[in-house]
């Protein structure tokens, strides 16, 4: 009887002990698996998310988010054991001071950042990169100002052709497009530009004899501070001088809207005077929501990137994830810059900002998502400028902004507006 009672007592105890051992073992295995999960790698995007340039900043951020989702879904950073990318965002706001403060805060709060991108407006980018350079955080930007990569910085990379290069190459190209369509080149030109860094850089060669060298006389040259409250004084001068084409270089959609509406009121729109702009905001989806398509028809603008042949996969992925009707330079830049950081991390083999910076300097990408996101090769010179970065010319046609140059990759042929 005593043996029977002992057996009955020890049976449950033994089973309980076995269960505890099994659970303990499972917990140890689970803890071990968790411990082996690689730490997320943090990258930053600082763009305007409030103020006049918020929409453009949102497009950049959405492009970066599209790339992060794609990279993480495909297994993350393979050289780091499948570590996921984590995108940390900061709001550059509506001034250079706010942009600089955003960079200082983000870097202080996230000391393990390995790289970043932003800040859309060149004036903001100049301020932010003063901070990121000191912190040795590699920074990729689509901003145009020549001064961004002429300061001797080692941690700044400009994927766009600088504004000076764009203006030097773009206007002759556009003049030839006009000549091919009308049979004669324009003889007079007008200039209206705001006083932010990129328009100033873009127009500098034109104001210093570039247009005269092309056989054109500058009959109007006006500078203003954005955003405009009333475009009447500027457009009255366009009406009185009647240039054969107008360089309208603004950094805000609201200024473009006011300018085109006033030109229409004065019977100068719809091709009466061809308008050429600069910057991706001129092709943002909301432009056509605010400006009648007939006023936009034929308007051309110069960018560093737009939807081209060979970018269909990226465009479709972006549109599916964001719900946007088309991909702009901003979305392509956010996507492409993220992939550049991914490629540099794979080559560095560690989540270290200095090592990532060294690898970006060594990149020469001709294929893959990072290369597909940009026209031309992804390779940077010692100053951080992308080598041979070509410009892209876009034109509003039937309510949609389509690439018309370079002609071998463009999605449409250029149409010179006619009066």
Tell me what each language-model feature is:
Residues 2-4, 13-24, 35-419:
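Extracytosolic ligand-binding ectodomains
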